Amino acid sequence: MAIGVESVQASSSDIGDSLSMANKIIGSGGSSNSGDRSRTAEFVELAIPVIGEDNRITGIHTLGLQAAWRFEQYSDFSNTDNPKFGIKYAPTERLLFRSTYQKAFKASSLYHLYMGNTISYPTLRDPARGDEGMQYKTRSGGNPGLTPEESDNISAGVSYDVPMPENITLSLGVGYFKYDLEDQIASIGAHIC
């Protein structure tokens, strides 16, 4: 069993020079930005060896359960609960089946939230002009309205330890993973459609 508490204070600050701030540098412009966040978390994880070496029964070499929970509180948006449940079952010493379900959460970075607007002139290829490279004025910046990225994850698999000569190991396995992401956080690059 593991139990823990975590506390984090984070801040970010990027102060632009006066020429960049006034858009006086050709081909570039800048801005200043800053942001901060405090976060606390509590977590517990429990591994339960249901059947093992001391209480083995026919058809079950080992059986184990796992349960975990994490609760986080953020100063700049809501709280989050993230559970995890897993099972491992080995009918023999060499064959193992496993499965896990987990809710996951990723907060927006301070950079993605608070980055100031900047202007640049990247070279883009315009398909309407025969893929000719041209410079276009683009503006980019943070978004203080971003929501956290959340996901539901399921994994399952089976592995088999192949009998081999002494000091040589070979394990074969097959796994299945499914990740359902919501509100995925990503930067959009400059492009022409």
PLM region spans:
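Extracellular loop and loop/strand-boundary signature of outer-membrane beta-barrel proteins
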Residues: 26-34, 68-73, 141-144
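Outer membrane beta-barrel strand-and-loop segments of large Gram-negative receptors
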Residues: 147, 173-193
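Residues that define the transmembrane beta-barrel architecture of outer-membrane proteins
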Residues: 36-42, 79-83, 140, 150-154
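Residues on the lipid-exposed face of transmembrane beta-strands in outer-membrane beta-barrel proteins
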Residues: 1, 42-48, 85-89, 99, ...
